[in-house]
Amino acid sequence: MRIVTFFVIMVWMFTAAEITRGEEKGKMSQEIFLPSKGGDWKWDGKEMKYNSKALFGYMDGAAEFYLAYGFENLTVRRFEKSGGPPIVVELYEMASSEDAYGVFSFEHQDEDVGIGQGSEFGGGLLRFWKGKYFASIYAEGEGAEVESGILEMGRATANSIRSTGPEPKLAGFIPGKDFGLVDKSVRYLRSHVLLNQRFFIAHQNILNLSRRTEAVLAQYLRDKEKVQLLLIRYPDLKEAGDAYRNFMKVYLPEARGKDRSKTEDRKWTLARQRNEFVVILFGASAEADAEALLKATEEKLVARR
């Protein structure tokens, strides 16, 4: 039995990043068939697949980012055109549509181009999400019709994904543009490492973020200054309470039992727990503005429960 188990493990390890040929093996999952062409670009017949362990060999230093969002597997195809640069299609299968949205949201900055459930195209890179999939499509160089080729490849890839999926409900629990929400600033996060990359709080995970929690970070323009709103949902009331108390102890020790304090930059930080939610506002010059935004968030939480 041990010999059989060892054999199975060895086979699994050596096939983690396999290269297959032919359309009959072009299936990423039971419902996904990646395209064989896009515009004048045609698939070279090779398909590379990576699981969570093999992902580190494909992208040095970036694998942890996808793993934080529940990465399951990656399929990569290259498309070639005579006289033009190759176009690469990377299709990431995540644990859920919420995770795919999170990957997309993390670096969202360009205008939507109408592909998938959310997309952007800039600097020769097309990014979009649809269902539980996130796609990154780019050319390995410049040339005529490259941009149109990337967009055609994107539309074909999106059409191969039959199912859509919901955005994180938590993203709808924050105030909108009427309260100064900055366009394209909403980030859906599943780890404190990712949170720190967008807005540094502490080296330690003082808010106890994990795959069991959800967090939304967004920027608001208040009195011509940008403030950061962080909304976190925990699995239950106890975990929310533990995280809130730890945050107040470590980050706002000067609050002394209150829900707010000025930090070293002389700006206000406010934090409250509401049931399984923790709401924190960073960097407000005016206490009244911070209170208004925090209260608006609490009202959204009550309305959507």
Model-derived features with residue positions:
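Soluble, non-membrane globular domain cores that form compact, hydrophobic packing
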Residues: 5-8, 12-305
